[in-house]
A protein has these predicted regions:
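Acidic donor-binding loop of glycosyltransferase active sites
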Residues: 148-162, 175
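Active-site donor-binding acidic/aromatic loop of nucleotide-activated sugar
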Residues: 113-118, 131-140, 146, 196-197
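A conserved mid-protein helix/loop that constitutes part of the nucleotide-sugar donor-binding site
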Residues: 75, 82-98, 116-119, 204, ...
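Carbohydrate-associated surface elements
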Residues: 35, 56
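Short hydrophobic beta-strand element within catalytic cores of glycosyltransferases
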Residues: 176-179, 189
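Short, structured helix-loop element that forms part of the nucleotide-activated donor/catalytic region
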Residues: 36, 41, 105-131, 219
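A short, well-ordered alpha-helix in the C-terminal region of glycosyltransferases
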Residues: 205, 212, 219-234, 240-246
Length: 252
């Protein structure tokens, strides 16, 4: 189960169908986070049928990215993901508008029907006269170039993510990760030694987190390195294979 069974994501009919299927056929369910399991159980699923095995990323794709570099006087920040209101790119723009030491790169494309939001983001940048510090780049399957460019990676979703794959990718790249404290993300950054969590939609807290990094770069280089070590240890593919194999071997 890789998505949260909530009314925000699925119709009541779809949720009921999934739950009834697991009950009728006594289906064992693997959830990609405790948050996903909680949503499954809250929707009527049987907790005993559901086991949490946290998701994973191919760490080999990120390990050759150069070490973090704070690029002189600037803090290069990357926002990566679909251009959509719930992804919270506007929150990031608002948070950095008065931080003259920040350069922001927003990578992603708008889905069909969400061009208005993309235009809104561009207008924000224009209204705040941030064209020299904020750039937009289209969606790309190769994100290594963007991760190499940045020193800080921001995940700013205003709605809970079932897991938070991009958070793990930022950690694997050895970047300082600031992420939203909701959904499955706190299961990834479960200690302040590995990254920074901020409340969803909280511009003030996000602004403070960015400023804290700028004022103590040495401290947050350590955080970035510890985050990378944790991501390799807990969220790489060999770990996932081991956990699933163990789970299958123990099924009765």
């Amino acid at each position: 189960l890789r998505d949260a069974l909530t009314k925000d994501n699925f119709s009541p009919i779809v949720i009921k169908t999934v739950i009834n299927f697991t009950k009728i056929f006594h289906t064992n369910v693997i959830a990609n986070s405790s948050y996903t399991k909680e949503c499954f159980v809250s929707s009527g699923g049987n907790s005993k049928q559901c086991t949490v095995i946290l998701n994973a990323v191919n760490s080999n794709e990120f390990l050759d990215i150069s070490e973090i570099n704070f690029h002189g006087g600037y803090l290069n920040i990357l926002s990566l993901g679909r251009i959509s209101p719930w992804k919270g790119q506007h929150i990031v723009i608002e948070a950095i508008k008065d931080l003259e030491f920040v350069k922001l790169r927003i990578v992603g494309s708008a889905n069909f029907g969400e061009d208005d939001y993309f235009n809104y983001l561009k207008k924000l940048v224009s209204d705040y006269n941030l064209q020299h510090r904020v750039e937009f780049c289209p969606f790309s399957l190769d994100i290594k170039e963007h991760l190499s460019w940045c020193s800080v990676f921001i995940h700013s979703s205003t709605s809970p993510e079932p897991f938070g794959r991009v958070v793990v990718e930022g950690m694997l790249a050895g970047r300082v990760v600031i992420a939203t404290d909701s959904g499955g993300v706190p299961e990834i950054i479960n200690n302040e030694s590995y990254g920074i969590l901020v409340p969803p939609g909280d511009i003030t807290r996000l602004n403070k987190a960015i400023n804290d990094i700028y004022l103590d770069k040495d401290k947050y280089k350590v955080v970035a390195n510890k985050g990378k070590d944790k991501a390799i240890k807990d969220f790489s593919l060999p770990v996932l294979y081991t956990n699933i194999t163990s789970y299958l071997n123990n099924l009765k």
